[in-house]
Regions:
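Acidic/His-rich, metal-assisted hydrolase cores and their charged scaffolds
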Residues: 1-229
């Protein structure tokens, strides 16, 4: 069984090193307003990248969103996150006092347009601690999960109306997918040499493309299984 989420993407996915370089460039050259970065709360390595970058450029990180706060705390407790003292704080109404806006980096949930996420509340003026104003920059350090396009675009439009600048992976290399592209799928099939191959995790279109990719590296048509539950 093989994940089909990235099956329509040709070539190879970008490396985390490239993403880190793009994020560093954004943080380094950000001199006006707050920098708000939306990311998956489970992507702890991305949080570590941002911690290291912000420490390098003397920025303070604020966490927004329950799952972000909880996952970061768990990762710290287990030793998966290395955090310099004083660089990271939980977002509260008083937490940012005395810190210039351009020195604030807010890592938030809501990269998929979730209705009750922290970023969604910011875009609608309902966040208890953050009011989006002209000069703020919002970075979507994520890919849009298929099916979430409308929700994400809706939030982007609301943020722009409030005066924020929005950066996505279409503008800069601020995210690499957690799912294999076609060339990586071929490599896995060639390494494992399965007798049977079942594309999973994707609608019929994505799974069919994945099956077609498998056929190009020698899988037999009768051994490729397209199954609906």
């Amino acid at each position: 069984m093989s994940d089909s989420t990235g099956s329509v993407r040709k070539g190879f996915s970008k490396s985390e090193k490239e993403v880190g370089e793009a994020l560093e460039g954004i943080v380094k050259n950000h001199h006006k307003g707050r920098l708000i970065i939306a990311a998956f709360s489970s992507w702890i390595s991305r949080v570590q990248q941002l911690i290291d970058i912000c420490h390098k450029y003397d920025k303070t990180i604020f966490l927004s969103g329950r799952s972000m706060v909880e996952n970061v705390q768990i990762a710290k407790d287990l030793g998966y996150l290395k955090v310099k003292p004083g660089i990271m704080k939980k977002m509260t109404p008083k937490a940012t006092q005395g810190i210039p806006p351009h020195k604030q980096v807010i890592i938030t949930t809501g990269s998929q347009g979730e209705e009750f996420s922290a970023l969604s509340r910011m875009s609608e003026g309902r966040h208890p601690s953050i009011e989006i104003v002209k000069g703020d920059t919002v970075v979507f350090s994520s890919s849009i999960v298929p099916g979430n396009e409308k929700s994400v675009v809706g939030i982007i439009n609301k943020l722009i109306k409030l005066g924020a600048k929005v950066i996505t992976k279409d503008d800069r290399e601020v995210h690499t997918g957690g799912h294999a592209f076609q060339e990586e799928q071929k490599i896995m099939i060639q390494l494992i040499k399965p007798k049977y191959f079942m594309p999973v995790f994707g609608d019929l279109y994505f799974r069919t493309v994945h099956k077609d990719t498998a056929l190009t590296v020698g899988m037999k048509e009768e051994n490729c299984l397209l199954i609906d539950n």
